[in-house]
Design a protein with these regions (language model features):
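All-alpha prenyltransferase/terpene-synthase fold signal
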Residues: 1-330
C-alpha cells in the first residue's frame, strides 16, 4: 500500500529531541528539552502498542508524535514551569514536566482541529494532516469523498492528542484539575467565537480582543502560570493567582497581537503558513478591527475583500498596505 505523503514526512528520533530554536534563552531550551524527552517517552510506546494491534494505527499515532516533536515555541510549558517556581515549586519536578507535555498535546489537538476548520494547507512548513490524508485517500481510490475523509482522520487524531493531554495530568491535585478543565472550556469557547467572527465580519475592537483572549491569550500564558502554581502549592496559588493573572493576561494579549501581525504580514518561511492566510480566512483580529474603524472610504473598500479565499497575492498586498495606512499597526 503506497504511503508517499506519510512516508516522506519528517520524523524525530530519540537522538534529535533537543529544542530546535537556538535563539531561545537557555532556561527555555532546558524546559523544552525535558518536555520533548517526556513526550517521546509517552508517545513512542503508545505508537508501538497500537501498531501491534493493527498496523493501520501506526500512521495516525505517528502524526501526533511528529507534530509535538517538530518544533514550536514551547511557551506554555515554560510559563507553567515558571508559575510552579513562583510559589516555591521545583522547576525540574516530574509533575511540572508532565504538565508541560500536557500543554503541548493540548496545543496539538487545537492545531489539528484548527487546520481543518481553516482549511489550511500547511503547518510549520509541512502539509497539514487533513490534506495529507485526503490526498492519500484519492491516490488509493478509496470510496467516499477524499476531503471529508482527510478531515475526519485529522479530527480523530486531534481527539487522541486531547485524551493523551489529560492522561499526563492524572496525578494532578484537585485545584490544578479545576484550572485545567477551565482552560479546556475557554480554549473551545474561544474557537467557537473565532469561527463565528470569521463569517460575521467582526468590526468591534473590544469583541475582537475578547475572541483573541479566549482563543489563545489566556491559554498561552495566564492558565499555564496558574496550573504550574497550583501543582506546586494549591494554598499559595489562591493567594498568587490574581498576581499571576495581572501579569499573564496583558502578556497573553500582547503575544496574540504579535501573532495577528504575523498572520497578516508574515512570510511563509517565518510562519510556516501561506502568506496572508489570516486575511484570506477573515480572522476576526483586533488588528483588522482597528483598521476597519480607522479606514477611509477607499481603504474600507480594499479591506472589504478580507475573508475571500481566492485573494490573489496582489490583493493581499493591497490589503496589507491599507492596514498600514490606517495606522492600525501603530
Amino acid at each position: 500500500m503506497p504511503r508517499r505523503d506519510l512516508a516522506t514526512r519528517p520524523t524525530t528520533n530519540r537522538h534529535s529531541l533537543r529544542f530546535v530554536t537556538a535563539q531561545a534563552p537557555p532556561s527555555l531550551r532546558l524546559i523544552a528539552d525535558r518536555v520533548a524527552v517526556r513526550l517521546d517517552e509517552v508517545l513512542t510506546p503508545e505508537l508501538e502498542r497500537w501498531a501491534a494491534l493493527d498496523p493501520d494505527l501506526r500512521d495516525p499515532m505517528a502524526e501526533i508524535r511528529r507534530l509535538v516533536l517538530s518544533g514550536g515555541k514551547r511557551l506554555r510549558p515554560a510559563f507553567c514551569t515558571w508559575g510552579h517556581a513562583a510559589v516555591g515549586g521545583d522547576p525540574e519536578a516530574q509533575i511540572v514536566t508532565d504538565a508541560g507535555a500536557a500543554f503541548e498535546l493540548m496545543h496539538a489537538f487545537a492545531l489539528f482541529h484548527d487546520d481543518v476548520m481553516d482549511d489550511a494547507a500547511s503547518r510549520r512548513g509541512q502539509p497539514t494532516t487533513h490534506t495529507v490524508w485526503g490526498r492519500r485517500h484519492a491516490e488509493l481510490g478509496w470510496t467516499g469523498e477524499s476531503r471529508r475523509f482527510g478531515e475526519g482522520v485529522a479530527i480523530l487524531i486531534g481527539d487522541l492528542a486531547f485524551v493523551y493531554a489529560d492522561q499526563m495530568l492524572a496525578n494532578a491535585n484537585q485545584t490544578a484539575w479545576k484550572i485545567w478543565n477551565e482552560l479546556r472550556i475557554e480554549l473551545n469557547v474561544g474557537q467557537v467565537l473565532d469561527i463565528l467572527g470569521s463569517v460575521s465580519g467582526v468590526r468591534d475592537v473590544a469583541q475582537a480582543e475578547r475572541i483573541c483572549r479566549y482563543k489563545s491569550g489566556k491559554y498561552t500564558i495566564e492558565r499555564p502560570l496558574h496550573l504550574g502554581a497550583a501543582l506546586a502549592d494549591p494554598d499559595r496559588f489562591e493567594i498568587m493567582g490574581p498576581v499571576l493573572s495581572a501579569y499573564g493576561l496583558p502578556l497573553g494579549d500582547a503575544f496574540q497581537m504579535r501573532d495577528d501581525v504575523m498572520g497578516a504580514f508574515g512570510d511563509s518561511t517565518t510562519t510556516g503558513k501561506p502568506v496572508g492566510g489570516d486575511l484570506r480566512e477573515g480572522k476576526p483580529t483586533p488588528l483588522l478591527a482597528r483598521a476597519l474603524a480607522a479606514a477611509s472610504a477607499a481603504q474600507g473598500q480594499v479591506l472589504a475583500n478580507v475573508g475571500r479565499a481566492d485573494l490573489s497575492d496582489v490583493e493581499v498586498a493591497d490589503i496589507q498596505q491599507a492596514i498600514v495606512d490606517t495606522g492600525a499597526l501603530a
